[in-house]
């Protein structure tokens, strides 16, 4: 079992990636697990980043590591000031449940509520899933 890390959020790259500074450690990139936020060039990409920033930036966070991704980032559940940031991004309509990696099935009911009330990205008629957007926009 990987221990929970207590850190300060010092940067937000986008709606699902943070930079944290943990006691006695260097800065680390954290990828929020089980969610996928719109890319920067997608509709709601910048709003998703702002949402995560308002929730976590310059706040203490509990990082619950689950894995490392292919980019060397720690994939984790993140709790900022008592708020589950992964879940809250879904609730606000600022991220999708990442079908390929989801373990917490309750995230789907949260996403369905956000979709039904047209929150965030669900205000668009046909929002494009970030993983489909990336597939269609490879460099």
What are these regions (language model features)?
Residues 1-139:
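Small beta-barrel nucleic-acid-binding modules, primarily SNase/OB-fold domains
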